[in-house]
Amino acid sequence: MTDTLPTRRRSRFWLYGPFMLLVILAVAWSAFWFYARGRVSAEIENALAREAQRGRTWTCTDRSVSGFPFRIELRCNALALTSTRWGDAVRVETGPAVAVAQVYSPGLVIFEVSGPAKATLPEGRLFDLSWKSLGTSLAWRSPERFALVASEPRGVLTTPGLATETWGAAALEAHLRRNPTRPATEQAVDIAISAKGTILPPIDALLGNAEAGEIDLQATLTQAESFRKGFNPDALETWRTANGTLELTRLVSTKGKARVDGSGQLILDQLHRVAGDLQLAAAGIEQIGGLRIGNLLGGLGGFLGGRGSNAGAAPGLTTLPPVSLREGRVFIGPFRLPLQPLPPLY
């Protein structure tokens, strides 16, 4: 009689193992996400406390932290900032705001804010700002960089005793990036700003031209660490005493038939006014500050030692004598323009 061999029971590990592994991973990821959420909440509280010590109070209405499973989202139904760093209190209020970071890429934060916004400024001024869309991004890891993109931003400035001014653009972009090629002691940050369809009342009044314009600016700011304190009198004074400079490597501004190309360097003088030297080329400018100049600028270059050569200028542009900002005044060559004195920034 033949003996029957016992049948080996098949292991069910491969049937249940993947499922159990998936459950373990899900539980571990959930634990990690809630841990990260707790860390973010704690860091927010610490950051708000540090800001309050520096004279800036942030208010995030109905604050919440969500985004499970792959994101961390900080949401505010309204966002407000009150700063006392300018003497008189400055308050900015916006609509809903959200900051988002991927759990697997926490070094990049995307920030979106809904309008409108309202700013209460010193001397009783009010600035109302609206936009179609507004988004920013901030990368913490080297090289640090920041970007802002706005569609149809529009601002209305109300100053007691003066006419209301409306500022705006069809599109605006701004990019900042720490320059990795400059010496670390320079603390250099590259800046690129472009705007299309601009409406800038002071420029309109200066040139007697209300047509929409375009601006393309590239520059490098040195001693940029001064502005980790924010943009306020203390930060500006720290930047000035550290011999900070704004190096304009490219400036192109068009407004109807008028165009200005230039470069140069700007600083703050001891009385906190903008100072420096610019190399400009221009075309189509009919007046400056109400003074009819016609073809005067083109003739100035030839009059001042033949410096009106257009060798370095774009086609159709006339190279101007050096433009200097000193002692609160604007000079073209030796001639002072009939403009209001430049006010101190702080």
List PLM regions with ranges.
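Extended terminal
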Residues: 2-19, 61, 234-245, 251-253, ...
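Loop-centered beta-sheet repeat module
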Residues: 2-5, 19-22, 150-216
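Hydrophobic membrane-insertion alpha-helices, especially the h-region
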Residues: 16-33
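Alpha-helical transmembrane signal-anchor/signal-peptide segments
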Residues: 34-52
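N-terminal beta-strand/beta-hairpin edge segment
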Residues: 53-184, 251
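Extended lipid/amphipathic-ligand handling interfaces
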Residues: 63-65, 94-105, 130-143, 167-184, ...
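Flexible, membrane-facing loop/turn or short amphipathic-helix motifs
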Residues: 80-89, 117-129, 154-167, 197-210, ...
